[in-house]
């Protein structure tokens, strides 16, 4: 399997892991659809109110506080990039530890009642050196 296919496979596994953790309050799987004029979350109109957080730029001990600040401002979603040049600095060597632990960040968002909108790299529009 070439490097590109390994990377695509890993991204798909990450997406499946994130989605498998998404449950509504009753414990059953939720739904997200595009309605005629709005998004529908579990069959009800849903407006995405999103803030963007660059988890790799914030010390881990401040992650939850930043998520809570976004929620206090009325947001319901956190947009995050997967900064791929941080997670795979050398071909085939992946780092999702410490400040790079994107899954831990997603779990904190979920714990605080927030949704995640994941935008995988390699390109990120945030003044980030490739």
PLM regions with names:
Residues 12:
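The two-metal-ion catalytic cores of nucleic-acid processing enzymes
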Residues 9, 31-32, 97:
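Generic detector of short alpha-helix boundary/capping microenvironments
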Residues 5, 15-30:
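Bacterial Sec-dependent signal peptides at the C-terminal "C-region" and cleavage site
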Residues 1-9:
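Bacterial N-terminal signal peptides that target proteins for export
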Residues 63-130:
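Aromatic-lined substrate-binding rim segments of carbohydrate-active enzymes
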């Amino acid at each position: 399997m070439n490097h590109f296919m390994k990377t695509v496979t890993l991204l798909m596994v990450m997406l499946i892991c994130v989605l498998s953790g998404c449950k509504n309050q009753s414990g059953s799987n939720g739904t997200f659809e595009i309605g005629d004029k709005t998004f529908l979350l579990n069959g009800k109109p849903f407006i995405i109110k999103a803030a963007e957080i660059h988890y790799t730029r914030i010390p881990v001990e401040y992650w939850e506080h930043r998520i809570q600040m976004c929620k206090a401002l009325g947001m319901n979603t956190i947009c995050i990039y997967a900064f791929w040049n941080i997670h795979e600095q050398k071909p085939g060597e992946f780092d999702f530890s410490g400040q790079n632990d994107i899954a831990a960040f997603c779990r904190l968002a979920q714990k605080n009642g927030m949704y995640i909108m994941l935008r995988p790299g390699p390109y990120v529009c945030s003044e980030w050196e490739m």
